[in-house]
């Protein structure tokens, strides 16, 4: 019996917005793939590029970071910091030969449960097309 591959997706979610949207999606029974594991952080601005690389090198096939919409950060400028880091990370991934599509940044407010479910479903489809992530040392 052969096992079919299922992606392992990590969603690093801002406590104030994207995590609340994930909670709302669950409460309203909006389905999203069980391949998505949500990790709550205080702010998307606290997500260091190393966290994303660490997730990929330890079994994640894709990582999506969710934060508050620009201008709505609970900590004022955290999401702008996340955006700057993300642009640098995408350049680094490309230089290393890693598909930048494996990593994504999304702005999802606490009231956007449906958007959360839709984005996770779409990201799952993207990762399935890319296939398993193979880290070569």
UniProtKB/Swiss-Prot annotation:
It is an enzyme of class 1 (oxidoreductase). Keywords: 2Fe-2S, Cytoplasm, Electron transport, Iron, Iron-sulfur, Metal-binding, Oxidoreductase, Transport. Binds 1 [2Fe-2S] cluster. It comes from the Archaea. It is found in: Cytoplasm. Its cofactor is [2Fe-2S] cluster. GO terms for cellular component: cytoplasm. Signal peptide: none annotated. Its EC number is 1.12.99.-. One of its GO terms (molecular function) is 2 iron, 2 sulfur cluster binding. It holds the Pfam family FlpD. Belongs to the MvhD/VhuD family. This is F420-non-reducing hydrogenase iron-sulfur subunit D. The gene is mvhD.
